[in-house]
Amino acid sequence: PVFQSSRHALYQEALELLSKLSFDEISDIISTGSNDSKPCSTTAGNEAATSEATPLIYPCFCSRADIRAASAPQEGDRFTVYPGTCRRLIASEPQRAKQRLANNDRHSMRIATADTTITFHDEVFGTQQYHLAHDIGDIIVRRSDGIYSYQLAVTVDDLDMGITDIVRGRDLLRSNALQIYIRKALIKAGFKPSEPTQPFHPADGSNKPDDVTISYAHLPLIDNAAGQRLAKRERSLDLGILTAHGATAQQIIGYCAWLLGLQGDLKHTKPQPMSADEALGVFSWDAVRTNTSDRTLDQGEFNAYFGL
């Protein structure tokens, strides 16, 4: 997401809009879907029709230890499905919840997810289906320290900036279903781009956020020789370090194109520098989806290619 200090007011506005919705007010986008993202659909279960008392955004007083003790972690992408403790508290003891808020008890804010399956097409991994309540649960949209969550921030950023081609890592496939849900709720709540003087002009010719066709693609991850994912939190090698050591744009683009399979089978080819125009000229999703396994970086070959 865009650096939070410069977008804090926009994220706050988005959360305030969502907070004005009750759970039953978004039942139409749950049961019939919304055309803001044509490659996806929703299928609602029975729970959505019986959750009228549940606010869409609600406070959560649980600690991380509480959640770990009551939840079963999901495999692969580190998702832990929230057990719904405070959602039940809001429904069964609303006055107790209000009193805790009045006492300034530390709390985060969560979005209530529905008994709903969201289906979308991914350019690399094909048709994806996730049940919001079972596979994802009610996730935090604002932490107890006031920081807005990644899930809310990227959804707001994409909607605000009119992004129509969403490309992330394959570990965020499950998150994409949640972001579709949040996006639909934001549109229902009347969210508007922060800079209306810059018209929304998606490539497909539509002119409103709820008309636009969105393309989703999730790419294989890059692992080191030990099988650990390269990530900022692990202080993995990044573009700043590469450019500081003299790596050229053509070298970097060529290496990325090679990793994506645009220069042939990774086992039988070596990366070759190329320009952005050259990479675009050979790009196709068919080539990328030929090999959807995570890539393992050979540090010696990597260093030799970049002259490190």
Give the ranges of each region predicted by the language model.
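Active-site cores that bind ATP or allylic diphosphates and position pyrophosphate for catalysis
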Residues: 33, 40, 49-54, 64-231, ...
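Short coil/turn segments at secondary-structure boundaries
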Residues: 62, 83, 292-296
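Alpha-helix initiation and N-capping motif
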Residues: 8, 64, 79, 83, ...
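Generic recognition of short, well-ordered alpha-helical interface segments
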Residues: 9, 13, 106, 174-177, ...
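A general structural signal for well-ordered secondary-structure junctions
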Residues: 24, 53-58, 76-80, 92, ...
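Conserved catalytic-core subdomain
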Residues: 226-308
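Alpha-helix boundary/capping residues
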Residues: 18-25, 74, 183-186, 246, ...
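Conserved alpha/beta enzyme-core scaffolds, especially Rossmann-like or related mixed alpha/beta domains
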Residues: 1-33, 40-66, 216, 255-281
